[in-house]
């Protein structure tokens, strides 16, 4: 019997063996429909970007979360940087990022990130992270340091953050983040509250809504953003309810995308939402008052985030 070592990164079956609602391994997954087409690329830019990231000791959520758009985005020289390591303190059953006891923060990471952004000549960058429940501020100060370093090295750049929930430390985290504010504040609601215990153990639906609204009230000039994965078992009514909840909590921008099971040990895909339904939900979101909406099978919260920020249609 293998002894559990919390300092090592656990994935898949090992990671999900300790969540409160057990998930049976999928033996006959749903067949992917024709509209789920992963964009492959043999572009040398992909390998060059991976080399650059490794040289600067950086991690991307694109790689760690097995994003279906990785080759497309890397081929265009864009990436969503994941700071504070590659070991998350949570065990979300939809997510492919590894779980474990995180390593100490790298004090060189802000500078390495800023230099990499400069080399890539980015004008819009997305910064996200693992959950760091081991830190008193959830890593918010490190976020601010990264944002400030990126801006100092890259004048005129726009910075979007996709943050964890800072559960139990919201005010402290926002106090720290105030020292280096982003241009867009994103926190994903992910799914309907009924599915939280299974999909997001350790998270809390009302808390996530409160984080988004509290940030907006403290910094009203900064757009707030959130996203949902569809196909986890939610109903159409639940999706519409979540969208209304987000608007009631002053969220400005919304992304809707199809959930894709990373491994057979993760939550299974309950259904593949049709492009037509994504279009209908996107139109409803606009009617509800979201200023920017990206809704489509392969949409992810940071997919073409620069175009999303400009209000262009992304699907």
Curated annotation (Swiss-Prot):
The record's Gene Ontology cellular component field reads: cytoplasm
In short, the EC number is 2.8.1.8
Q: Which residues form the Radical SAM core domain?
A: 73-291
Q: Which GO terms describe its molecular function?
A: 4 iron, 4 sulfur cluster binding; lipoate synthase activity; metal ion binding
| Catalytic reactions of this protein | [[Fe-S] cluster scaffold protein carrying a second [4Fe-4S](2+) cluster] + N(6)-octanoyl-L-lysyl-[protein] + 2 oxidized [2Fe-2S]-[ferredoxin] + 2 S-adenosyl-L-methionine + 4 H(+) = [[Fe-S] cluster scaffold protein] + N(6)-[(R)-dihydrolipoyl]-L-lysyl-[protein] + 4 Fe(3+) + 2 hydrogen sulfide + 2 5'-deoxyadenosine + 2 L-methionine + 2 reduced [2Fe-2S]-[ferredoxin]
One Pfam family of this chain: Radical_SAM
**According to its UniProt record, which cofactors does this protein need?**
[4Fe-4S] cluster
Explain how, and how many, cofactor molecules are bound: Binds 2 [4Fe-4S] clusters per subunit. One cluster is coordinated with 3 cysteines and an exchangeable S-adenosyl-L-methionine.
What InterPro entries does UniProt report for this protein, alphabetically?
Answer: Aldolase_TIM, Elp3/MiaA/NifB-like_rSAM, Lipoyl_synth, rSAM
Q: What is this protein called?
A: Lipoyl synthase
Q: Which organism is it from?
A: Coxiella burnetii (strain RSA 493 / Nine Mile phase I)
Recall the taxonomic lineage recorded for the source organism.
Bacteria, Pseudomonadati, Pseudomonadota, Gammaproteobacteria, Legionellales
Q: Which gene encodes it?
A: lipA
């Amino acid at each position: 019997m293998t002894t559990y070592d919390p300092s090592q990164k656990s994935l898949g079956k090992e990671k999900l063996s300790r969540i409160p609602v057990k998930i049976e391994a999928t033996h006959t997954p749903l067949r992917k429909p024709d509209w789920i087409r992963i964009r492959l690329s043999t572009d040398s830019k992909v390998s060059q970007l991976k080399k650059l990231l490794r040289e600067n000791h950086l991690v991307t959520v694109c790689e760690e979360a097995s994003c279906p758009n990785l080759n497309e985005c890397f081929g265009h020289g864009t990436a969503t940087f994941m700071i504070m390591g590659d070991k998350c303190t949570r065990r979300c059953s939809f997510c492919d990022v590894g779980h474990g006891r995180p390593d100490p923060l790298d004090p060189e990471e802000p500078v390495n990130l800023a230099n990499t952004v400069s080399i890539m000549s980015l004008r819009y960058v997305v910064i996200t992270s693992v959950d760091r429940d081991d830190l008193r501020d959830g890593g918010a100060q490190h976020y601010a340091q990264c944002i400030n370093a990126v801006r100092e090295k890259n004048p005129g750049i726009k910075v979007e953050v996709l943050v964890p929930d800072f559960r139990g430390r919201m005010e402290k985290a926002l106090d720290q983040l105030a020292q280096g504010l982003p241009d867009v504040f994103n926190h994903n609601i992910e799914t309907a509250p009924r599915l939280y215990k299974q999909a997001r153990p350790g998270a809390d639906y009302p808390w996530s809504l409160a984080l988004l609204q509290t940030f907006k009230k403290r910094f009203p000039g900064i757009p707030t953003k959130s996203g949902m994965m569809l196909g986890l078992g939610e109903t159409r009514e639940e999706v519409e309810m979540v969208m209304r909840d987000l608007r009631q909590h002053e969220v400005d921008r919304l992304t809707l995308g199809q959930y894709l099971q990373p491994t057979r040990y993760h939550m299974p895909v309950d259904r593949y939402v049709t492009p037509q339904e994504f279009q209908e939900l996107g139109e409803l979101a606009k009617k509800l008052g979201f200023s920017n909406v990206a809704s489509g099978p392969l949409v992810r919260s940071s997919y073409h985030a620069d175009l999303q920020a400009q209000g262009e249609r992304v699907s």
